């Protein structure tokens, strides 16, 4: 039995069908029709068993294989065409016009408390001070006794201090002065440090008070230190922080750990010292407390007060930030109001 293959008709039909292919699914269906397990080529190959003549069988098999190669070539070309089309469509879909202005990302801003703390640190570091830190949970000896604060002092009362034990030995520090005590106990004079950090007092939260706030305290120890040294350093700080035109005034006060003690005022930055509502028409605004280190404090840390003298000061970070940035309510510093943060 002799079989013939109409090669031209098969090729022509495939070319017409393949032209109509638009996606990969249609491509796979058509390829299976011709080259699949139940496709045309498989059917033609199965016809070999019906040919008895060996030479005719060889010739027929050769013709089928040649046809198969031609079909595969046509399918390969179409596959490349479809892949290129897919690539172009994907590029078109993902195309970005680089000439369009980009959307600027919002950049975070430091909270004013952090910003102010860094400003203060940079000023004092520039004057030769180093930064020291210590624990917020303190022992009463470091927080009170070593700082010449006797048991009868009002600061040690329950209504002012957060005690963590019934014997009042553990507490949340009420100032960062304990850091100064710890530093002096492990360091030999002379020294100059500032100790920034969180402190805790039993205050109601309002426009000017908070049970948790931030301080920067300073300590300078050397020979022959006097009030004039204290005032000089504070003037440099005030002028760098608030502006060159600021003057400093020391008013006598009382702190158990300094003698003499002072409240430190600056000339009003809002009226230039002429008098206004902010300074209550005095021309001066209080910014911190200071004084010469009490001899009893030096004795607590084994410094000889006859050889060494020093000055100490302490300021509320929130207070000086409120003054510098004209913020009327301390509570604004603790809110996450993005409008306030962006404008500060």
UniProtKB/Swiss-Prot annotation:
Q: Which PROSITE patterns match?
A: AA_TRNA_LIGASE_II
Q: Name one GO biological process term.
A: phenylalanyl-tRNA aminoacylation
What is the enzyme's class at the highest EC level?
ligase
Q: Which InterPro entries match?
A: aa-tRNA-synth_II (IPR006195), aa-tRNA-synth_II/BPL/LPL (IPR045864), Phe-tRNA_ligase_II_N (IPR004188), Phe_tRNA_ligase_alpha1_bac (IPR022911), Phenylalanyl-tRNA_Synthase (IPR002319), tRNA-bd_arm (IPR010978)
Provide the reaction this enzyme catalyses: tRNA(Phe) + L-phenylalanine + ATP = L-phenylalanyl-tRNA(Phe) + AMP + diphosphate + H(+)
- Oligomeric state and partners? Tetramer of two alpha and two beta subunits.
- This chain belongs to which protein, by name? Phenylalanine--tRNA ligase alpha subunit
- Please list the residues that bind Mg(2+): 259
Keyword entries, A-Z: Aminoacyl-tRNA synthetase, ATP-binding, Cytoplasm, Ligase, Magnesium, Metal-binding, Nucleotide-binding, Protein biosynthesis
The organism's taxonomic lineage, starting at the top:
Bacteria, Thermotogati, Thermotogota, Thermotogae, Petrotogales
Q: Taxonomically, which superkingdom?
A: Bacteria
* GO terms under cellular component: cytoplasm
| GO MF, one example | ATP binding
Membership in a protein family: Belongs to the class-II aminoacyl-tRNA synthetase family. Phe-tRNA synthetase alpha subunit type 1 subfamily.
EC number(s)? 6.1.1.20
Q: Is Cytoplasm given among the entry's keywords?
A: yes
Q: Where in the cell is it found?
A: Cytoplasm
Q: What is written in the cofactor note of this entry?
A: Binds 2 magnesium ions per tetramer.
Q: What are the required cofactors?
A: Mg(2+)
């Amino acid at each position: 039995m002799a079989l013939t293959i109409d090669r031209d008709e098969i090729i022509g039909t495939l070319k017409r069908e393949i032209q109509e292919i638009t996606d990969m699914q249609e491509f796979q269906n058509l390829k299976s029709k011709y080259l699949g397990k139940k496709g045309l080529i498989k059917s033609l190959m199965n016809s070999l068993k019906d040919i008895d003549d060996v030479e005719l069988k060889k010739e027929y098999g050769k013709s089928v294989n040649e046809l198969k190669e031609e079909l595969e070539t046509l399918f390969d070309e179409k596959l490349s065409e479809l892949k290129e089309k897919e690539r172009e469509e994907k590029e078109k879909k993902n195309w970005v016009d680089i000439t369009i202005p980009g959307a600027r990302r919002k950049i975070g801003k430091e909270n004013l408390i952090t910003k102010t703390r860094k400003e203060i640190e940079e000023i004092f570091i520039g004057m030769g001070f180093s930064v020291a830190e210590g624990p917020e949970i303190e022992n009463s000896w470091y927080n009170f006794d070593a700082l010449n604060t006797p048991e009868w002092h009002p600061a040690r009362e329950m209504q002012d201090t957060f005690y963590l034990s019934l014997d009042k030995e553990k507490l949340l520090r009420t100032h960062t002065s304990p850091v100064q005590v710890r530093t002096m106990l492990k360091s030999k004079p002379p020294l100059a440090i500032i100790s920034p950090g969180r402190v805790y007092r039993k205050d109601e939260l309002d426009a000017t008070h908070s049970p948790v706030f931030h301080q920067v305290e300073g300590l300078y120890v050397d020979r022959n230190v006097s009030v004039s040294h204290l005032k000089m350093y504070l003037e440099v700080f005030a002028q760098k922080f608030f502006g060159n035109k600021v003057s400093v005034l020391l008013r006598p006060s009382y702190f158990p750990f300094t003698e003499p003690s002072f409240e430190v005022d600056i000339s009003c930055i809002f009226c230039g010292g002429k008098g206004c509502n902010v300074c209550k028409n005095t021309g001066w605004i209080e910014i911190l407390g200071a004084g010469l280190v009490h001899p009893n404090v030096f004795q607590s840390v084994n410094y000889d007060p006859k050889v060494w003298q020093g000055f100490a000061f302490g300021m509320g970070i929130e207070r000086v930030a409120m003054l510098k940035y004209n913020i009327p309510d301390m509570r604004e510093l603790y809110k996450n109001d993005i409008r306030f943060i962006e404008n500060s």
